[in-house]
């Protein structure tokens, strides 16, 4: 792997960490900064949003559901494992990983927790844009395990 490829790979690994940190620590307030204007956000077989406005709507809907929970708070932590990065061009890449989400209503520490809220296979198509930043063109999450508290199902209307 040449130096440019190593650099791009590290930048994409940092993108993964920064993205999930935005969700876990900032309530997804700036999440659309991680997406291209022409993005797609796909969750499962029947949920597909287009553009930054669609992504923003999803996270705004999520915030409305959180506001109805205990203390109006939901603690989340997203963990990415088994990361694979395939550079498909100088400015394009496919990123695959397993995302393990822990989530619970109320202030930390969440008590009586039994396990992950969701485990998903995640696929990102990424593009480095003119400003040099990598962004998501496509976010596709395929849930493999869903915990007993189906919060995300409520957000998705399921």
How would you name each of these model-derived features?
Residues 101-105, 126-128:
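Beta-strand elements of well-folded, non-transmembrane domains
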Residues 42-44, 84, 116, 120, ...:
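Extended, composition-driven regions rather than compact fold-specific motifs
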Residues 11, 77, 117-118:
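Short, glycine/acidic-rich beta->alpha junctions
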Residues 110-111:
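Extracellular loop and loop/strand-boundary signature of outer-membrane beta-barrel proteins
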Residues 92-96, 117-154:
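Short beta-strand edge/turn micro-motifs at domain boundaries
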Residues 89, 114-115:
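Carbohydrate-active catalytic/glycan-binding domains of CAZyme proteins
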Residues 28-102:
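A solvent-exposed, acidic/Ser-Thr-rich amphipathic alpha-helical stretch
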Residues 1-25, 29, 33-37:
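Short, low-complexity N-terminal intrinsically disordered segments enriched in polar/charged residues
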């Amino acid at each position: 792997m040449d130096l440019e490829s190593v650099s791009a790979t590290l930048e994409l690994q940092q993108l993964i960490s920064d993205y999930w940190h935005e969700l876990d620590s900032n309530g997804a307030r700036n999440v659309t900064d991680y997406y291209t204007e022409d993005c797609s956000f796909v969750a499962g077989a029947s949920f597909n949003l287009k553009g930054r406005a669609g992504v923003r709507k999803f996270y705004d809907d999520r915030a409305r559901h959180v506001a109805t929970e205990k203390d109006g708070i939901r603690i989340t932590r997203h963990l990415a494992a088994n990361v694979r990065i395939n550079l498909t061009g100088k400015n394009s890449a496919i990123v695959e990983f397993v995302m393990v989400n822990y989530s619970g209503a109320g202030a930390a520490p969440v008590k009586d927790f039994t396990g992950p809220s969701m485990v998903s296979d995640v696929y990102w198509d990424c593009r480095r844009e003119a400003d040099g930043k990598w962004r998501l063109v496509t976010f596709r999450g395929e849930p493999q395990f869903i915990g007993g508290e189906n919060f995300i199902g409520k957000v998705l209307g399921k």
